[in-house]
Amino acid sequence: CIIMASGLGKRFGSNKLMASFHGAPLIHSVLDVTGSVPLFADRLVVTRSREVHDYCQSLGIPVLIHTLPNRNEALCLGLTHMLKRHPDLSGCLFALGDQPLLRPRTLERICRRYLECKISPRHSESVFPDSDFSILKSKLPQNSGIAEKSPIVQLCSVQMTASPEPSVSTTVGSPILFDRAYFDELLHLPEKAGGSHVLRQHPDVVQYVTAEVPEELMDVDTPEELKRLENLVTIE
C-alpha cells in the first residue's frame, strides 16, 4: 500500500495533512486505517512535507520525502521504492493521505475483490452485492463482466433514489489497486498524469467496489471541507 501525501495544500492555506482532525493530524486517519488491514505486505508514505515525514517516522511507518513537482514522478518514486523492498509484489493499492473517512472494511473488500479476480477471473457481479445491479450496470463505466487475471480495482460510491423513478448517481475515486501487470505503465506515466491515466487505457479490466458510505471517497481541499468531515464523524 502506497499512501500519496504530496499535496501542497494551496487551497487549504497550510499543510492540510497536519491539520487537526479530531485531535490528531489529518493524515493519521489513513495511516490508522491502512495499518489495520492484514492483507497489506507493507506500507509506504510518499510526501513533500518534512512535518509529515517526521510524523510518520515517529510512528515507525516507512516514508519517503521528495521535492518532485509532478504526480507521475511521486508515484514512480513510491512504486520503485516499494518494488525494491518487495520485488515479487503482486499488486499495489494507492490511497490518498487526505481521505479521513475511509474504512478498514472497505479496504479489505477492495483487496478481496482483487484476490477473487486473480483466483477466478470469471468471478462475476459480486461488485455490488447489496444493490440493484440491473440499474447500476447502466450507470458505471463498464467492463466486459469478466475480470481478467490482471485486474484493477477502484472504489466507487453509489447513491440511489426511488422517486419519481429509480435513478442512480455514481462517483469513482481512490483508493485504486493495480495488478503488477500495470506497474511498468505506472512507472512511465506522462508528465503530471496519475494512476487514472492507466485506468483509461484499460477500462475493460476495472472492477468496482462500493463504499459503505459515499463520504469515504471525500478528500480535503479546504478548511471548510475538513470541518464538514469532522462533523460527519461526530454525527456517526
Protein language model features and the residues they cover:
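Acidic helix N-cap motif at the loop->helix transition within catalytic regions
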Residues: 51-57
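Conserved beta-loop-beta/alpha segment of the NTase-like Rossmann-fold superfamily
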Residues: 69-122, 134-137, 141, 148-188
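Short, structured coil segments at secondary-structure junctions
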Residues: 39, 58-60, 202
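Conserved donor nucleotide-binding strand/loop of the catalytic core
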Residues: 59-73
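N-terminal glycine-rich phosphate-binding loop and ensuing alpha1 helix
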Residues: 1-50
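Short aromatic/basic micro-patch
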Residues: 20, 101, 176-177, 208, ...
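Conserved alpha/beta core of the MobA/IspD/sugar-nucleotide pyrophosphorylase nucleotidyltransferase superfamily
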Residues: 1, 184, 188-236
